[in-house]
Curated annotation (Swiss-Prot):
The gene is ispG. The keyword Transmembrane helix does not apply. It comes from Bacteroides thetaiotaomicron (strain ATCC 29148 / DSM 2079 / JCM 5827 / CCUG 10774 / NCTC 10582 / VPI-5482 / E50). It catalyses: (2E)-4-hydroxy-3-methylbut-2-enyl diphosphate + oxidized [flavodoxin] + H2O + 2 H(+) = 2-C-methyl-D-erythritol 2,4-cyclic diphosphate + reduced [flavodoxin]. SUPFAM superfamilies: Nitrite and sulphite reductase 4Fe-4S domain-like. Its cofactor is [4Fe-4S] cluster. One of its GO terms (molecular function) is 4 iron, 4 sulfur cluster binding. Binds 1 [4Fe-4S] cluster. The lineage of its organism: Bacteria, Pseudomonadati, Bacteroidota, Bacteroidia, Bacteroidales. Converts 2C-methyl-D-erythritol 2,4-cyclodiphosphate (ME-2,4cPP) into 1-hydroxy-2-methyl-2-(E)-butenyl 4-diphosphate. [4Fe-4S] cluster binds at residues 521, 524, 555, 562. Pathway: Isoprenoid biosynthesis; isopentenyl diphosphate biosynthesis via DXP pathway; isopentenyl diphosphate from 1-deoxy-D-xylulose 5-phosphate: step 5/6. This is 4-hydroxy-3-methylbut-2-en-1-yl diphosphate synthase (flavodoxin). PANTHER family: 4-HYDROXY-3-METHYLBUT-2-EN-1-YL DIPHOSPHATE SYNTHASE, 4-HYDROXY-3-METHYLBUT-2-EN-1-YL DIPHOSPHATE SYNTHASE (FERREDOXIN), CHLOROPLASTIC.
Length: 613
């Protein structure tokens, strides 16, 4: 893979109805219904809305045999109205259901964590190598008949691994690790290869974007080692709703798409399924602007490890770099200095004029030729002002620098000026490639100056800024290269929206926390309560609790697992019933839905008496 130049990974083509995936085909977009699969009319109408919005596949939860059989009626209902969209059956826990679904759906998704292995109990199991091999044989014996049914019916499959539903067997041998998630997938892929079954799509998802990106990168490397080129389905599970869901999805999915990985995506929002499609389309279209871009002559630094990156070693300059959290620099060249206390930038770039009224606790950056050394202000130079920078005595200096301006003279200057923070700029179609190339050159030269990534936008819609900036910054954060971000928007959006987006990106990348985090699933036919209203009520009561993580899950398929690092959880337990969790431990079961939100808040109050609820 080329870190600096965009090329899509070459994958095998998979036939899914009349909409093939992988190979030379475009990146496909899909969603999943949240209606009961036994309600044919509701499923048909929702599937139509997904297709009308631009969805190319529709997935439906398939809990049992009767739901699997009803896929035929849903298919008939759609086709009778001219909707030829392929249907995907989503199967957990019961391989018999997958056998039936394969006769009626164009694709069947199975979960290796619960296909043959027992449901996860979070207990550590001990296996000898012989016993472990016997468990693999059990998978083979059950999986091969399913593959034969798929061959007979020309049905594709997705092997869909979820971080939240790894089996106890995998957890016991590999732990809760990317390696375990990859091996969970590879056990099934090796059987597919041995059985000459190639209509396979794979996915490895997590609500933790760091885990998701690292694991997909590792999976691709392992597949390449074993001569496999199956196409990838990308998604961030439990991404949430609103701004959080969009940023989190764009950050994780976008980081992989920008590296050419991914053949279909699903943006999992806790909103109406059809609302996911325009977000996914914007995400894909933005990434594809990189196609056929001018070549970037970057060189990978010897110490960089793409599969397991660590934070780049930098020298701390005041509160930037070293062990400090990534900073946020905000633009206020228009003289408007007001900030949201929850998202107060560390530095404000004021350009050529220092505002008369300044925000307390915020430091200001001025262009170097007008900087006069006033307390709480710092100079910013461009690459043509190196002599001026050498004459300046400030203990913190900023240097705006595009990759192509990184000359031997600039490198020599940085070697004698460790107090300089580089602000990496790019107007290249593949700005990720240029930002990476700049930092890798610094690393190769042994320079430890911190790097802040600057990106210019001209957006009038918050969603557009959220998607584009998260795509641009994602891989830089996951690569461990980011000491700060600077989003500069010349559209009509308020400074508050731009600032919140910057902080949201850092939180989604798990590098800096500025607000409550919600791990909420998009819901499906297994969700038997009003997910969107519940999320809104919980957010209204807890959004001020910075650093708290709350999981809001439709059902137990991924619930306890994906909430493993959440402080508290709210999980559907049946029609009208909710269970509450502290971490992954259930503390109350089968609470009536109408009482559950208040019971959750009451539990948090009693457990965290220092919090104001």
């Amino acid at each position: 893979m080329d870190l600096f130049n965009y090329f899509r990974r070459e994958t095998s083509e998979v036939n899914i109805g009349a909409v093939p995936l992988g190979g030379p085909n475009p990146i496909r977009i899909q969603s999943m219904t949240n209606t009961s699969t036994m309600d044919t009319e509701a499923c048909v109408e929702q599937a139509k809305r997904i297709v009308d919005a631009g969805g190319e596949y529709v997935r439906l939860t398939t809990q049992g045999v009767k739901e699997a059989e009803n896929l035929m009626n849903i298919n008939i209902g759609l086709r009778s109205q001219g909707y030829m969209v392929p249907l995907v059956a989503d199967v957990h826990f019961n391989p018999k259901v997958a056998d039936v679904a394969a006769q009626y759906a164009e694709k069947v998704r199975i979960n290796p964590g619960n296909y043959v292995d027992a449901a996860r109990t979070f207990k550590k199991l001990e296996y000898t190598d012989e016993e472990y091999a016997q468990e693999i044989q059990k998978i083979h014996d059950r999986f091969v008949p399913f593959l034969n049914i798929c061959k007979e019916n020309h049905t594709a499959i997705r092997i869909g691994v979820n971080h939240g539903s790894l089996s106890d067997r995998i957890m016991s041998r590999y732990g809760d690790t990317p390696e375990g998630m990859v091996e969970s997938c590879m056990e099934f892929l090796r059987i597919c290869v041995a059985e000459h079954f190639t209509d396979v799509v794979i996915s490895i998802k997590a609500s933790n974007t760091v885990v998701m990106v690292k694991t997909v990168r590792l999976l691709v490397a392992v597949m390449e080692q074993e001569g496999m080129s199956f196409p990838l389905h990308l998604g961030v599970t439990e991404a949430g709703d609103g701004e959080d869901g969009r940023i989190k999805s764009a950050l994780g999915i976008g980081a992989l798409l920008c590296d050419g990985l991914g053949d279909t995506i699903r943006v999992s929002l806790s909103e109406a399924p059809e609302a996911e499609i325009p977000v996914a389309r914007k995400l894909v279209d933005y990434v594809l602007l990189r196609q056929d871009h001018p070549y970037i002559p970057g060189m990978e630094a010897p110490e960089f490890n793409y599969l397991s990156p660590s934070r780049r070693k930098t020298r701390a300059v005041r509160n930037i770099g070293g062990e400090h959290l990534p900073v946020v620099i905000a633009d206020r060249m228009d003289g408007k200095t007001e900030v949201n206390p929850q998202f107060t930038p560390d530095y404000i770039y004021a350009g050529r004029t220092l505002p008369e009224q300044r925000e307390e606790g915020v430091e200001y950056i001025l262009d170097a030729d007008v900087w006069e050394g006033e307390a709480g202000t710092w100079p910013a130079f461009n690459h043509a002002q190196l002599p001026l920078m050498g004459e300046c005595s400030a203990e913190l200096k900023f240097l705006f620098m595009p990759y192509m301006a990184q000359t031997d003279e600039v490198i020599a200057c940085l070697k004698v000026h460790p107090e300089v923070v580089v602000i990496s700029q790019s107007n290249h179609p593949n700005r990720l490639g240029e930002h990476r190339a700049l930092v890798h050159q610094l690393m190769t030269e042994g320079l430890e100056n911190p790097v802040v990534f600057f990106q210019h936008y001209a957006e009038d819609e918050a969603e557009d800024l959220q998607i584009k900036s998260a795509v641009d910054m994602g891989a830089l954060i996951f690569d461990g290269l980011c000491d700060g971000i600077f989003l500069f928007n010349q559209g009509s959006l308020s400074h508050a929206v731009v600032d919140a987006t910057a902080f949201g990106i850092l939180q989604a990348g798990r590098t800096r926390t500025s607000k409550t985090e919600y791990i909420s699933c998009p819901g499906c036919g297994r969700t038997l309560y009003d997910l969107e209203k519940t999320i809104a009520r919980i957010k209204a009561a807890t959004s001020h609790l910075k650093g708290l993580k709350i999981g809001i899950m439709g059902c137990i398929v991924n619930g306890p697992g994906e909430m493993a690092d959440a402080d508290y959880g709210y999980v559907g337990a049946g029609r009208g019933k909710i269970s509450l969790y502290k971490g992954k431990v259930c503390v109350e079961k089968n609470i009536p839905e109408e009482e559950a939100v208040e019971r959750l808040l009451e539990f948090i109050r009693n457990d965290r008496k220092e919090l104001e609820l």
